[in-house]
Amino acid sequence: MMNESQPKLKYKRILLKFSGEALMGKSQFGIDPSVLDSLARDIAELIHMGVEVGLVLGGGNLFRGKALSQAGVGRVTGDHMGMLATVMNALALRDALERIDLPARIMSAIPMLGVVDPYHRRKAITHLRNGQVVIFAAGTGNPFFTTDTAACLRAIEIGADIVLKATKVDGVYSADPLKNPDAKRYDYLTYKEVLTKGLEVMDSTAICLCQDQGMPLQVFDMAAPKALKRIVTGERVGTIVGANHDQ
């Protein structure tokens, strides 16, 4: 629970989007246990501050549908395989959270009786209010929708204050900063600017969904010291995307 010595929270309920690739650490495949444990500790710090935390994990560390698609595997089949990869990542993160005595629930868009709970909006909100971390798995349960879109959808459904997208760079740039030294980093962007400039924040479906519902986004470097704690207490870290630059 939050006490008087803790800083005031700007965001009390968040949806954290963490890519599957980030879980690999420096490896080329799979899950780096040190990354998983670090993420669990960061989440625990938020819970102890009184923040309600929902998560969506990607699955790119375990499965990438593009290669199979090029080999002739259908898009729908590939997307379903990718959804299952996100469930595997969710199971790993739940285990890491429970090892530090942090209660967590996995809610899957694809029913998997005996493995994870089926997604249920009202139950998810109840779990969050009770201090449990809720990991939303299997995307939206439908092909052709990314985990970014799933993250924005779940954030809107549970009434989150913001979507936080953890990446390997410190915000959104006008071009790839690794390839273009003149690339400009943005502090603030509107949804319209993201769409018209074609910036790689999230796919257009996710951005349009957030725009329609007024859900702000913040893109940040997960490796930045105390990034999540700084964000929920109102510090600007990375790039904020909203209806205007005064978000």
From Swiss-Prot:
Residues holding UMP: G59, D79, T140, G141, N142, P143, F144, F145, T146, T147
GO molecular function: ATP binding; UMP kinase activity
Pathway: Pyrimidine metabolism; CTP biosynthesis via de novo pathway; UDP from UMP (UMPK route): step 1/1
Compartments (UniProt record): Cytoplasm
Entry keyword set: ATP-binding, Cytoplasm, Kinase, Nucleotide-binding, Pyrimidine biosynthesis, Transferase
GO cellular component: cytosol
Regulation of its activity: Inhibited by UTP.
CDD domains, alphabetized: AAK_UMPK-PyrH-Ec
EC number: 2.7.4.22
Binding site for ATP: K17, F18, S19, G20, G60, R64, T167, Y173, D176
GO biological process: 'de novo' CTP biosynthetic process; UDP biosynthetic process
Key word RNA-binding present: no
SUPFAM superfamilies per the UniProt record, alphabetical: Carbamate kinase-like
Catalysis performed (reactions): UMP + ATP = UDP + ADP
Assembly description: Homohexamer.
PANTHER family according to UniProt: URIDYLATE KINASE, URIDYLATE KINASE PUMPKIN, CHLOROPLASTIC
The protein's role, per its UniProt record: Catalyzes the reversible phosphorylation of UMP to UDP.
Assigned protein family: Belongs to the UMP kinase family.
HAMAP family per UniProt: PyrH_B
Protein name: Uridylate kinase
